[in-house]
Amino acid sequence: MSTQVFHCRALLLRRLGETRASASDLTRLSAAQARAMASAAANGQLNGDHRGPRPLVLCGPSGAGKTSIMRKLTDEFQNTFGFSVSHTTRSPRAGESDGVDYHFVTKDNFVKLVEDGAFLEHAVFGGNMYGTSRVAVENVTETGKICILDIDVQGVKSIKKTDLNPDFVFIKPQRVEDLEPRLRKRGTETEDSIKRRLSVAAAEIAYGDTPGNFDIVIENYCIDTSYSQLRGFMLPKINALNIDMKGDDE
């Protein structure tokens, strides 16, 4: 690593709230990531005193199409976005891996993390606990990527009480009635869970439609059209990070 690049990275880390930077901290950023973060700083895209760009919060009722739209975003900009790995007390489903899909922990461990203030947001659904830790988000943003948080309205309300300062996007169906067939099509939901999800969907949509709660609200009647709206919202932020538009490494 050249002295010039080393000092550039040191400057970036100091600007992002670090008073000291060890050699291991500095080498964690590639030259491309350092340039991206420098561009972000110049264009106001850095997240306050946090290291890295502002995260992206995606919210909406289950079955509204968040995952499909999010997948199109990450497929197009492969090296621009990263996902935080949430904690949960539920058991792993077939094909899920600890540390990849979720951090699977016991209820006692989860409660201890809550008491320690480790979570930016946490909630209980279907008798299971879910939470997003600050460390999980920082692990992504420290690499110069935009961290995506896929959370519910309760989580959004909690995040708004923190200093995370993300962009908030709400994705909703045209009608609440559209959600039930989508949930059933998954084949992973029980009758009870479907009823629970539908019962809260109307309240979530009401919160999403309230002016000021989200930066943009997308009504998902067509995946391609909805993705175009999300892409248009995020593109200036992506450009400001100076990351290759095709997601290729420099």
Question: What do these predicted ranges mean?
Answer:
Residues S2-P55:
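Extreme N-terminal, non-catalytic leader segments
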Residues C59-P61:
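P-loop (Walker A) phosphate-binding loop of NTP-binding proteins
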Residues K66:
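Conserved lysine of the Walker
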Residues I69-R71:
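Post-Walker A alpha-helix
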Residues Q78-P92:
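Short beta-strand-centered segment that lines the nucleotide-binding/catalytic pocket of NTP-utilizing
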Residues T80, D108-A118, T132-G187, M234-L235:
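ATP-dependent NMP and nucleoside kinases share a basic, alpha-helical "lid"
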Residues A94-K112:
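Conserved P-loop
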Residues T188-P236, I243-E250:
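Small-molecule kinase domains that catalyze NTP-dependent phosphoryl transfer to phosphate-bearing small molecules
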